[in-house]
UniProtKB/Swiss-Prot annotation:
It comes from Mycobacterium ulcerans (strain Agy99). The lineage of its organism: Bacteria, Bacillati, Actinomycetota, Actinomycetes, Mycobacteriales. This is Prokaryotic ubiquitin-like protein Pup. It holds the Pfam family Pup. The keyword Coiled coil applies. GO terms for biological process: modification-dependent protein catabolic process; proteasomal protein catabolic process; protein pupylation. NCBIfam families: pupylate_cterm (TIGR03687).
Amino acid sequence: MAQEQTKRGGGGGDDEDVTGTTAAGQERRKKLAQDTDDLLDEIDDVLEENAEDFVRAYVQKGGQ
């Protein structure tokens, strides 16, 4: 009875792809952080100019 053995890869041979993916993920995270900071800065500017109108725009009229 002959038995055949097959060797399965454990997925450890593609370190270069993992590094590329990690770098891309870090770049995306930095971009999202910058976009979030820009949005928060824009909101701060609006609030500094006219906070009353900003709040009034988001408060429902008539207590509803």
